[in-house]
Amino acid sequence: MSDIKTNKETHTQVSTDADNLTTTPINKTQCAIGQRLYFLPHYLGRAHAVFQNCLFYLAKQFLEPYDGGYWEFYHLSNGGFVMALDDDNTITVNSPNGSSATVDAETASIVVSLMTLSDLSFNLQTDSDELHKVVTSFHALREFALEHTNSNTILKLVD
């Protein structure tokens, strides 16, 4: 699966104060409906099914009021991905670290996705291809989260 068709590109402009440099923004592009079946295996290999089950479980545990829903899939321009709950309502994230915040669905989705990738990385065999894919996906999503409007809240909830 080398060519995944996408649509709906979203841009985030990021600039740093240090030396007045501008960094390249990480863009997200929605996965085409016909490519959804191949989306997670492309990024996570055989770990995709465990990731998805864990994501839904952690969403149920830590997101209020979550009881299932439709998730959009997005490719990130840095090689990563994000799954975002398609919901216009605010969601309260009750983090296992004791923090909580009421945020939009995308922010909540980033938080639970980072938690899931982190949790999954501890449960995969060392030096496996799946572990490498999960860790790479975690770091790519974390880079995207650092550029997000709610980056401080995301970091507070996943720390």
Walk through the language-model features, giving the residues of each:
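Polybasic, proline/glycine-rich intrinsically disordered low-complexity segments
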Residues: 90-159
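Amphipathic, interaction-prone secondary-structure segments
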Residues: 45-90
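Terminal domain-start segments
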Residues: 2-60
